């Protein structure tokens, strides 16, 4: 393929069908050759230009076949095609310009033209307008945006001039109005994506820091200054040479991703979906290594490109604004700082190269003045220029380290860290943070990059400090005031994931980094040990709460022994809450809040009472009964009634549930006689979606499986299930559930009524629902793993199941257990993105632990049911 593509169908071919039959393979041939050159690493700017020129020839050839030379019509490329850029599967946007008489006269010829182009395989998007109609349509700035980049394909000088005049500023959209409209459009577009590019499946084109941001800057420059590209603004003083070069470099990075994505997807796909990420990474040459997957490297490069584009575009938008509005009189703040139109400006000419003290002073001023809108563009640019010369903390002097700690202890510390991270200063001061900036993990559990997750954790800590966490974190506001030094929690949050991607245990490696940082910044040995311990153990509370039975005193004793002190417990609890809630917007819920609070209070009590002599079982039973009795008495129940209900409840019940749960269960049992079935449901936490379902029933084959299948059909996700043997051959089933699907209405009364109806029927007819696996989950399949161990002193068998998550998973597992004639005594459900990690305590139908042969039969049945292959 030459730089001026010569491939074109024979213009002498008589029939349109024959002409299209010649043109189609030629277009395919062009794309194949461009793909080959793409794989060879040719610049994307050249490839998209070559494809546009190849399509130009087809367009002109088709025009000459269909439209008379004296038609009075002209053909113009608009939009991206007008810029001379065509990605492999992009639309081909064209404008036919001519007066209304010419449009009507040649209506059939135009229809023939567009049909012919579609037949060739070109995704044509067309408009037919007169100059006056162009002026009217351009009242919509999106239409104007497409027209200002028009390029004549078949048009004389008069037609080109007519189009230019129709959309000139005196007619529509003066430059200042256009700038404001495009800026508002950009901000609104960013909001649609959560104002971050750090999504699991980012949009290369329209997402924050994407190609559309660069195009927006170009449109503004074209309308305001009449220049075709941002490089031309360097000479006008609006853009620095380094900024223009950086934007050009990052544009090439994103354009290469987009070009490859179109090839891999074979459609105009703009989102880096999981469907394509791995294939695209392989095509671009990103290889796996022991520390990172190739796809993670590719995504990190994307996130870093998007972040840099956002930083520079923010500066340019501010400069464009100043160009229209003019500079305001500076408002001195002292120390070489001032406010200019609400932006913080520094006398950067007096900054020595690499003077980190001046940089830290800048952030201190920013934190001290809430009215600051942001950094002045010239100051932000100066900061970017000195960034590479700033020392890391390891080689900085003691004064600089003291200034950093002052920022950490000062007002709005989390905002300051966020700003430092966004502007690259934090990564320069702590190189390990720069290493994880933009780093993603190829799974569905971590929905943010490591640096973005870290900042989300710090943001949650700031909520604790501001007292605004009560709604989502039930006891954080009680724990926060007890912290001796809040900055230690910030440091633990900053370092807890800083070693991800190095290989090895990131908690241990991060603890080494945290200790070195604390010692370098002259923290006391006690403070250093606390931060180091928090980083090393930051997962411990979450794992204990979600994967172990925290109603078991041995579990609490082990956890409390590990923690050792009330101070460590307070810090670890807050770090754990902030960490889980900062991992994914959907991960934190009322159930996890209560679970962690229960573990916190149980550990706090164990520490208070002493770890050497934990209370015996009989004492714990007595305390639980008395606490529940007090609650029931307050509700008006007499002791005779209370004793009768307590007698119908298994002892283990009093060790597994909180007093208010016991009181609710006992009060509910007043309504039922022996041999009857009772179903009750309530909100586990007032004003929250979490529900607690209590089922009292004669023991029946398939009871647990039927309840689980019904909850699944109604759209509820089960987080915990407990099955206890009660007197008179009855069963206590207690489920903690949350609405998981949109059709789960969250009404406890309706849910209880549905379960009553199901349990009144034939349980053997209740089957799990069949639902499709969501698209994202399909790309994270792995073979299930089933492990067995003893529990409850050897009286039960514990199953640990790790499998790809999917709708109805627990219902299918329950069905398998039923078909194997096994009894479920406890179920703990945990989902981590695409991974379901569930634990069950079971026995055979005679209440005995499973034999080796029964274990193997169950393993085979579960793997056959859950294996994604």
Swiss-Prot record:
Pfam families: GlnD_UR_UTase (PF08335), HD (PF01966), NTP_transf_2 (PF01909). The keyword Zinc-finger does not apply. Residues 1-332 are annotated as: Uridylyltransferase. The gene is glnD. This is Bifunctional uridylyltransferase/uridylyl-removing enzyme. Its cofactor is Mg(2+). GO terms for molecular function: [protein-PII] uridylyltransferase activity; phosphoric diester hydrolase activity. Residues 450-572 form the HD domain. Belongs to the GlnD family. Uridylyltransferase (UTase) activity is inhibited by glutamine, while glutamine activates uridylyl-removing (UR) activity. Keywords: Hydrolase, Magnesium, Multifunctional enzyme, Nucleotidyltransferase, Repeat, Transferase. It comes from the Bacteria. Residues 333-691 are annotated as: Uridylyl-removing. Its EC number is 2.7.7.59, 3.1.4.-. Gene3D superfamilies: 3.30.70.260, cca-adding enzyme, domain 2. Residues 692-774, 798-869 form the ACT domain. Modifies, by uridylylation and deuridylylation, the PII regulatory proteins (GlnB and homologs), in response to the nitrogen status of the cell that GlnD senses through the glutamine level. Under low glutamine levels, catalyzes the conversion of the PII proteins and UTP to PII-UMP and PPi, while under higher glutamine levels, GlnD hydrolyzes PII-UMP to PII and UMP (deuridylylation). Thus, controls uridylylation state and activity of the PII proteins, and plays an important role in the regulation of nitrogen assimilation and metabolism. GO terms for biological process: regulation of nitrogen utilization. PANTHER family: BIFUNCTIONAL URIDYLYLTRANSFERASE/URIDYLYL-REMOVING ENZYME, BIFUNCTIONAL URIDYLYLTRANSFERASE_URIDYLYL-REMOVING ENZYME. Has four distinct domains: an N-terminal nucleotidyltransferase (NT) domain responsible for UTase activity, a central HD domain that encodes UR activity, and two C-terminal ACT domains that seem to have a role in glutamine sensing. It catalyses: [protein-PII]-L-tyrosine + UTP = [protein-PII]-uridylyl-L-tyrosine + diphosphate; [protein-PII]-uridylyl-L-tyrosine + H2O = [protein-PII]-L-tyrosine + UMP + H(+). NCBIfam families: PRK04374.1, UTase_glnD.
């Amino acid at each position: 393929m030459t730089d001026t593509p010569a491939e074109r169908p024979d213009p002498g071919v008589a029939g349109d069908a024959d002409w299209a039959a010649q043109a189609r393979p030629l277009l395919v041939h062009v794309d194949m050759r461009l793909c080959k050159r793409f794989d060879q690493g040719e610049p994307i700017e050249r490839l998209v230009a070559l494809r546009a020129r190849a399509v130009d020839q087809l367009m002109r050839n088709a025009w000459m076949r269909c439209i008379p030379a004296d038609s009075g019509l002209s053909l113009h490329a608009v939009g991206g095609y007008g810029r001379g850029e065509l990605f492999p599967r992009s639309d081909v946007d064209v404008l036919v310009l001519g007066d209304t008489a010419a449009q009507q006269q040649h209506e059939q010829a135009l229809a023939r033209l567009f049909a012919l182009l579609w037949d060739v395989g070109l995704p044509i998007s067309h408009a037919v307008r007169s100059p006056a109609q162009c002026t009217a349509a351009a009242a919509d700035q999106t239409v104007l945006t497409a027209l200002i980049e028009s390029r004549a394909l078949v048009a004389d000088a008069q037609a080109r001039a007519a189009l230019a005049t129709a959309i000139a500023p005196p007619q529509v959209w003066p430059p200042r109005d256009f700038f404001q409209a495009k800026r508002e459009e950009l901000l609104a577009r960013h909001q649609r994506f959560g104002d971050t590019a750090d999504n699991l499946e980012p949009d290369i084109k329209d997402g924050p820091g994407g190609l559309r941001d660069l195009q927006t800057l170009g449109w503004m420059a074209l309308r305001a200054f009449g220049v075709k590209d941002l490089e031309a603004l360097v000479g006008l003083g609006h853009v620095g040479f380094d900024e223009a070069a950086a934007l050009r470099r990052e544009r090439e990075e994103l354009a290469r991703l987009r070009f490859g994505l179109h090839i891999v997807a074979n459609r105009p796909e703009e989102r880096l979906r999981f469907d394509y990420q791995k294939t695209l990474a392989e095509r671009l040459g990103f290889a796996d290594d022991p520390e990172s997957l190739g796809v993670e490297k590719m995504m990190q490069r994307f996130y870093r490109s998007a972040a840099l584009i956002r930083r520079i575009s923010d500066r340019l938008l501010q400069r464009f604004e100043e160009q229209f509005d003019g500079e305001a009189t500076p408002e001195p703040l002292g120390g070489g700082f001032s406010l200019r139109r609400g932006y913080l400006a520094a006398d950067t000419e007096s900054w020595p190269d690499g003077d980190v003290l001046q940089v830290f002073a800048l952030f201190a001023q920013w934190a001290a003045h809430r009215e600051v809108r942001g950094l002045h563009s010239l100051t932000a640019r100066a900061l970017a220029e000195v960034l590479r010369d700033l020392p890391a903390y390891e080689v900085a002097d003691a004064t600089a380290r003291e200034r950093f700690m002052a920022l950490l202890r000062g007002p709005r510390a989390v905002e300051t860290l966020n700003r430092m991270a966004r502007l690259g200063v934090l990564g320069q001061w702590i190189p390990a943070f720069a290493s994880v900036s933009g780093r993603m993990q190829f799974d569905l559990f971590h929905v943010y990059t490591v640096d973005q997750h870290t900042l989300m954790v710090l943001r949650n800590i700031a909520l604790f400090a501001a007292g605004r966490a009560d709604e989502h974190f039930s006891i954080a506001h009680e724990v926060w005031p007890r912290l001796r030094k809040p900055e230690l929690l910030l440091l633990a949050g900053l370092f807890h994931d800083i070693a991800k991607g190095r290989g090895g245990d990131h908690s241990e490696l991060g603890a080494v980094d945290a200790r070195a940082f604390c010692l370098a910044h002259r923290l006391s040995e006690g403070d250093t040990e606390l931060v180091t311990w928090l980083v090393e153990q930051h997962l411990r509370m979450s794992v204990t709460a979600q994967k172990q039975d925290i109603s078991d005193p041995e579990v609490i004793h082990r956890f409390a022994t590990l923690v050792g002190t009330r101070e460590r417990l307070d810090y670890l609890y807050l770090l754990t809450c902030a960490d889980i809630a900062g991992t994914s917007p959907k991960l934190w819920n009322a159930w996890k809040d209560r679970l962690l609070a229960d573990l916190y209070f149980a550990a706090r009590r164990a520490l208070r009472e002493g770890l050497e002599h934990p209370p015996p079982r009989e004492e714990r039973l007595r305390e639980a009964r008395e606490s529940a009795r007090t609650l029931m008495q307050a509700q008006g129940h007499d002791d005779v009634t209370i004793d009768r209900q307590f007698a119908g409840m298994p002892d283990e019940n009093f060790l597994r549930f909180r007093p208010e749960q016991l009181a609710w269960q006992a009060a509910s049992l007043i309504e039922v006689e022996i041999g009857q079935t009772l179903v009750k449901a309530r909100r586990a936490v007032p004003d929250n979606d979490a529900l607690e379902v209590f089922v009292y029933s004669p023991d029946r084959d398939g009871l647990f499986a039927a309840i689980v299948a019904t909850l699944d059909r109604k759209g509820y996700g089960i987080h915990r299930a407990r099955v206890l043997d009660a007197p008179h051959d009855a069963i206590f089933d207690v489920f903690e559930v949350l609405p998981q699907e949109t059709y789960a209405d969250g009404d406890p009364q309706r849910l209880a009524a549905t379960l009553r109806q199901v349990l009144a029927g034939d349980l053997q007819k209740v089957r799990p629902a069949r639902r499709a696996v969501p698209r994202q989950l399909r790309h994270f399949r792995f073979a299930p793993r089933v492990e067995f161990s003893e529990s409850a002193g050897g009286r039960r068998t514990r199953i640990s199941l790790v499998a790809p998550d999917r709708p109805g998973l627990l219902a299918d597992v329950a069905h398998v257990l039923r078909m194997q004639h096994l009894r479920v005594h406890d179920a703990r459900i945990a989902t981590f993105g695409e991974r379901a990690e569930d634990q069950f305590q079971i026995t055979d139908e005679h209440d005995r632990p499973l034999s080796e042969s029964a274990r193997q039969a169950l393993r085979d049945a579960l793997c056959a049911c859950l294996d994604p292959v």
